[in-house]
């Protein structure tokens, strides 16, 4: 059966988190009548990520570039579903995610969207960090964490921009939103189907790290600072 939804999961040494991510997706898939495929894009993995993905019935794609845009695009290029969904391996989607994505896209009023993101744990530092980016979220008018759209719209905007080594998701969301506006479709956010994400960045760097290092945050949000991106994403869990 040709899948209706292709879920793309970038994975760099994700043996710890990948099983829960896949299990959550399977639970969501059980609530729809359509088939799905899960594509795990292996990126420089030397742990059990590949074995775990295969054991869970996922398709495997390889992309070793230290560039999340290229990693996500590699998964999309291999996808066969008419709907593209992508989320990170350390996140767990809501059981009704796929059902709501299909419902909204069938209505034809939205071009795609994101989801509300909730941390797996709370602290004052994590809350303050979240509050600090609210103005940015308000300015962009998009949501992040988990992205969903029809394949035709993904391809129409050229997927993720490979010039970005960080905040590629923000750029993608803004371009997809602008693309939808041309045909009278808006950006959608899954408010009642939130994404639960790990706090491993806070665990590693500290709950107050982002607020105490505003210059670093500016470099990350610039999108093209290789050193900052490697420090925070690509060279993490590489030992």
Spans of model-derived segments:
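Short, well-formed alpha-helical segments that are part of the catalytic scaffolds
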Residues: 14-29
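Conserved donor NDP-sugar-binding/catalytic core segment of glycosyltransferases
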Residues: 95-124
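Cell-envelope/extracellular polymer assembly enzymes that use nucleotide-activated donors
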Residues: 4-6, 37, 171
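Short aromatic/hydrophobic "clamp" motif used to bind/position activated sugar donors
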Residues: 84
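A short, conserved alpha-helix in the catalytic core of glycosyltransferases
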Residues: 153-157, 164-184
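A conserved acidic beta->alpha catalytic loop
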Residues: 42-50, 91
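Short beta-strand/loop segment that forms part of the nucleotide-sugar
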Residues: 34-44, 61
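Glycine-rich, basic loop-to-helix element that forms the pyrophosphate-binding segment
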Residues: 63-79
């Amino acid at each position: 059966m040709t899948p209706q939804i292709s879920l793309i999961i970038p994975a760099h040494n994700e043996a710890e988190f990948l099983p829960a991510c896949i299990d959550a997706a399977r639970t969501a898939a059980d609530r729809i009548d359509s088939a799905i495929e899960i594509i795990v894009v292996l990126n420089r993995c030397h742990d059990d990520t590949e074995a775990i993905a295969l054991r869970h019935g996922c398709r495997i794609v390889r992309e070793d570039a230290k560039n999340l845009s290229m990693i996500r695009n590699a998964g999309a290029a291999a996808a066969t579903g008419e709907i593209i969904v992508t989320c990170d391996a350390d996140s767990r989607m809501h059981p009704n995610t796929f059902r709501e994505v299909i419902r909204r896209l069938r209505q034809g009023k939205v071009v795609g969207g994101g989801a509300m993101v909730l941390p797996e744990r709370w602290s004052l530092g994590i809350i303050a960090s979240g509050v600090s980016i609210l103005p940015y979220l308000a300015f962009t008018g998009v949501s992040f964490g988990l992205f969903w759209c029809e394949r035709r719209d993904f391809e129409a905007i050229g997927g993720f921009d490979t010039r970005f080594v960080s905040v590629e998701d923000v750029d993608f969301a803004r371009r997809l939103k602008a693309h939808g506006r041309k045909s009278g479709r808006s950006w959608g956010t899954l408010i009642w189907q939130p994404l639960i994400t790990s706090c491993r960045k806070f665990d590693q760097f500290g709950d107050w790290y982002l607020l105490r290092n505003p210059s670093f945050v500016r470099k990350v949000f610039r999108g093209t600072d290789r050193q900052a991106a490697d420090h925070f994403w690509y060279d993490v869990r590489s030992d």
